[in-house]
């Protein structure tokens, strides 16, 4: 449910900015779905720089379900967030039946990373930065 997804992403650290119903042909011209009925919730990251739109379509009916596809599937099926305490967050996300896809892996002294299956089967990457070196710093060295 959309309420469950909002609660899940709130637990990760995002903030609900607002939610609303979007219906009709005009909105459907944006998505290419025609006469649609969808409830959206806009979540914002704690720094205010990024937003994540969650949606629940009532019409038209869903025609494909990719929730259990692996991380290398074609399409936009995953998102990653930097978090402060990965182990603590994983415990808090258990109430949403979130499961680590394989394991938490540490990359040097820089990051601890994992993918989880969250609400509605969403594939979410979680990254805990361990030191002051950022992903950009690492990429610049290469």
What do these predicted ranges mean?
Residues 61:
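Conserved short histidine dyad/triad with adjacent acidic residue
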